[in-house]
Amino acid sequence: MAKMEFQKGSSDQRTFISAILNMLSLGLSTASLLSSEWFVGTQKVPKPLCGQSLAAKCFDMPMSLDGGIANTSAQEVVQYTWETGDDRFSFLAFRSGMWLSCEETMEEPGEKCRRFIELTPPAQRWLSLGAQTAYIGLQLISFLLLLTDLLLTTNPGCGLKLSAFAAVSLVLSGLLGMVAHMLYSQVFQATANLGPEDWRPHSWNYGWAFYTAWVSFTCCMASAVTTFNMYTRMVLEFKCRHSKSFNTNPSCLAQHHRCFLPPPLTCTTHAGEPLSSCHQYPSHPIRSVSEAIDLYSALQDKEFQQGISQELKEVVEPSVEEQR
């Protein structure tokens, strides 16, 4: 019984670790989806001609309207600048995410934001966003399955099924997340090359949301591996106990699905009591591992109760004989 409790505690620990990793992955992926820091960089914008926002490099020269000398009565001021090459441009910071793209403004402090979906090519507009949303949805389903297994399930067979579904959902979520991240990178590169000319970045790099998304993918796959490990361990433990029963009773090899089945009807009654404590076990063969684990757990509980009653009987009988 102590061994069973240890195995149950070890399984609960693995389920808890898997749920924590899944919750961490879900939080990181949601934060990266809502962020506008996937890509950061600069935009090359022409400076206004000797405007107020230009720091310096402009000087005034008086010129006459009739083309004469500068000391005539009719004059105007002409502004000249000696800036050439990249000095004629301002490099403004920008950041872009799946929802918004924000650019620093030259006229006043602050930034101007617009929807990134409106900037992308129509053929690739919703593909990456849909994959990212499905990735988060599968993670949420996996987390709910693991949480149900951890908090509400005391049946080993039901817990085994929940672990299997959670593991499959986590693997699908991780693969879909990897595809979604790669798709968005391609969408951004296509937008940088084919998007509006007033938006195209001069240089760009990956932001913190990009790395957060890949950390989320790593946590998701780690949770999937932990859940699969837990599921495989439970199945192998059951098969090991099943094979030990074959060694104990070789006659069971012909019909191995009935090895754990007791007689069809067993009753424990006492004088003056109705036949209410009879236990009826199924006589049909076991068709799945989860059914076998359910039956094995029930038999273990029954054997434990019978062992306790036998020990009490051994303790009570000597005391009764001494009193006689």
UniProtKB/Swiss-Prot annotation:
Organs and tissues of expression: Expressed in spermatogenic cells (at protein level). Expressed in germ cells within the testis from day 21 onwards.
Q: Name one GO molecular function term.
A: RNA polymerase binding
Query: Keywords of this protein's UniProt record, alphabetized?
Result: Endoplasmic reticulum, Membrane, Transmembrane, Transmembrane helix
- Which top-rank group of organisms is this from? Eukaryota
Where is this chain's protein located in or outside the cell? Endoplasmic reticulum membrane
- What is the membrane topology here? Multi-pass membrane protein
What's an example GO cellular component term for this entry? endoplasmic reticulum membrane
> Where do transmembrane segments lie in this chain?
15-35, 127-147, 164-184, 208-228
- Per the record, a Pfam family? GSG-1
Family statement: Belongs to the GSG1 family.
Role, per record: May cause the redistribution of PAPOLB from the cytosol to the endoplasmic reticulum.
Instruction: State whether it acts alone or in a complex, and with which partners, per the record.
Output: Interacts with PAPOLB.
- Its name, as the record gives it, is Germ cell-specific gene 1 protein
